[in-house]
Amino acid sequence: MGDIAKGKKIFVQRCSQCHTVTKEGRHKVGPNLWGLFGRKTGQAEGYSYTQANIEKGITWDEETLNVYLQNPKKYIPGTKMNFAGIRKKRERLDIIAYIKEATSK
């Protein structure tokens, strides 16, 4: 498991421009991530996903999010997430720990 505090710092630097994590958070360029864990791809209510995201059909958990964050466009070709990915596994695990904690309060 990752470090939540480190994950929050990385999230603020690299993810918060496009995503929110609170229950009342709005969609930005990317969807609000509240309730992400256990949800299928392309299912955040009120967000306009690409067909590729909708059809991927995986359920978000630590493992799938880790693979996705390493290289989003490779994992879901056709995603509109304009982000190259996070190479360092430790950073991905920290972000995942933060997202899991922040989106389940």
UniProtKB/Swiss-Prot annotation:
Binds 1 heme c group covalently per subunit. Disulfide bonds: none annotated. GO terms for cellular component: mitochondrial intermembrane space. One of its GO terms (molecular function) is metal ion binding. Heme c binds at residues 15, 18-19, 81. Its main location: mitochondrion. Keywords: Electron transport, Heme, Iron, Metal-binding, Mitochondrion, Respiratory chain, Transport. Pfam families: Cytochrom_C. It is found in: Mitochondrion intermembrane space. Belongs to the cytochrome c family. PANTHER family: CYTOCHROME C (PTHR11961). Electron carrier protein. The oxidized form of the cytochrome c heme group can accept an electron from the heme group of the cytochrome c1 subunit of cytochrome reductase. Cytochrome c then transfers this electron to the cytochrome oxidase complex, the final protein carrier in the mitochondrial electron-transport chain. This is Cytochrome c-a. It comes from Takifugu rubripes (Japanese pufferfish). The gene is cyc-a.
